[in-house]
Amino acid sequence: MSMATEVRYDCATDGFILHTPHRHAAKFMPYIALEGQPKSSVVMARLWVGEQDCGIHPFLVPCRDARGALCQGVSVSSPDVLDLPYFDVVDHAIITFEQVTLPRWAWLRGHEHDISAGGVFHSRLASQRDIFFSSLRRVEWGKLVLTASLIPGLKLSLALAIHYAQQRPLHAHNGRVIPLAHHALHRRILTRAYVTGLAAMALYEGIKQRHLPDGRHSSRFQTDAGLVKAVAVELMRTSLQHCMQRCGAQGKFLRNRIAPTLQLCDLVGTAEGDSMPVLMKVAKDILAWPDESQDDDTPLGQLLLRMRRQMNQQLADATDKLAAWHDLGCEAARLGWLAGNLEALRHLGSRDDIRTACREQLMLDYAPQLLHHGLCSPAEIAALPARQEATLDHVWEHHAARVPDEFDVRDLMAATPLGSPDLASAWFALAPSLHDPQPEG
């Protein structure tokens, strides 16, 4: 709400003038540093109509013209200033605006706001806070679009990591040669990555299908888009990290595609709003939901209700509501994370074994809270690790070998060394200058 970039309505042209008033109002923006392509950006700025502060609104701003040159009044830092390790993916830059003229249509006002012919601002919304969140809703679909960009790479990464575990030979002390997947810890970590990735994709797909018919007009759209951004993206990040770690050095090579996907995940996690404040906003919305919308008659569903009631009571009892909300930040994050994961479970469809594995992991994560609220006994919590290991072994046995076909990525796997049936031969084919010894055996 401290947005300093300003845009002023110009009665003479019925347009706007966008301006960066001081250094602290400069923006970090993606897709803008490199020349050669036309580029536009959605810029959030404080709208002034005369002397009236009309709140934060989105504006569509042409930044580079058809030749890729900067538009008049737009200045950006050179590509080497923001030295991101993945510069080739998103060309971030620092950007400022100096009296940039915008046409009337650049104002993404929706149906809630207008400026009359006499230069008077009108809004159906009651406060600047409502205006701000209405403005955010105008670009909320971006959270889903960005999340969707991760799914192909996530599927390929899971298929590659599982394939590597099945193909990588280990020489045991007794002379036997066994695959890496023979080690229970390794395959269970990968299976957990697999079910976590499926949960993330189910959350994204379920919420997308819920809102496609009505666009952004549902009262829950902003909260649901936040769940995708704050929960689905972070679940994908966890899954990708396991994939890269379980492939060792092989997982870090760019040509094996896992590392670039993890880098992209990092970018998505901070685009369209950083995941943590988005999760906090989701938690605040959840506090107002009716009980019946979350009551699924399970220990985790009951836990969500109890955490919510407890937080509402603490906020109601507080003299300083804002200070109380800040003090409850960790609890709010746990509430939002639990709500997002429960939503993912609902969208996993008929895959009962996948849902069971996800639920057992979630119960382990929330074991202290389940015990505190008396929703599980100590004996039930103590039995969870062994139960989950058995569930993960079942999922590995019945699904792991079919992951490349389930995700339809065999052609993509074939383009990577990790996806080759003979890893050593794949690398030697890429390095003809190497002395090639006789194949093993």
Please report, for each region that a protein language model flagged, where it lies by residue.
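Flavin-dependent oxidoreductase catalytic core characteristic
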Residues: 1-441
